[in-house]
Amino acid sequence: RTRKMTKKLGARTMPDYFEKRYGSKGMKILAAVIIFVFLVPYSAAVYKGLGSLFGAVFPGVESWVWMLIIACLTALYLVAGGYIATAYTDLIQGIITIVGVVCLVCAVLGHDAVGGVTGLIENLKNFQSVPGDPNPTTGAQLTNMFGGSSFRFLCFNIMLTSFGTWGLPQMIGKFYAIKDTAAIKRGTIISTIFCIVIGCGAYLIGSTSRLVLGGVLPKGGVDSVIPTLLMKILGGGTAGIILLALIMILLLSASMSTLEAVVLTSASSVAVDLIPAVRKKETKPEA
């Protein structure tokens, strides 16, 4: 329905859709401002996560250096190819992400502290929080479907990341590029499979962090849990270094995929919607 309506109205962006659908230029300007203002901290959070990750793996290099490199790479193919570039890179990065998640799940389950699929449940049952654990939890809570002190937060997080994304401007913008009804059916099946594998893999990896790290929060806080987990599992040996490099590419791909969509959407809200609307209003001849 979104694609049909935008094609009928000739809308290119979400603010443009609001103006043509409801005949309100003020709504267009307001939507463009909201999108730009709130997507900036969104992208900042992605940069911070990447900076923490690369800073943990390469402690000799400052985090801001990695942020600058990632920003330049993202800007390079966005400027060169626009939306077509993001579509192709999303496909490639999606394949890298799903391969990386599968490899990481296998590596985590194979760790001595986890002990495979069967050992994971048994070890979690026997888990005891160490003194100073910021979120003390018993083994019974960790293996109970409705247990654990973070159960409510987990449910909220799953709902937010599963259904909240439907209304994100950068996600809705992808609907505008749908070719036909057949593409919708194929895309629904493929994206569902990808989301199930990646989502379940991410939550499974997170659930093993207490076992691998012994319930001790790393020096960098919660943002350093996954980087520390990766270093502890994959830090030694040639195979470990190769797998760690693959995981780094996976995380970089996932983050850059998000960044490119956010940057393209926020930039278009200013360049396509906000600036032309304001200029037209300023240059409008007086009666």
Where are these predicted regions, by residue range?
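Helix-loop-helix module between adjacent transmembrane segments
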Residues: 1-78, 157-164, 251-263
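Loop-to-transmembrane helix boundary motifs in multi-pass membrane proteins
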Residues: 21-29, 68, 268-287
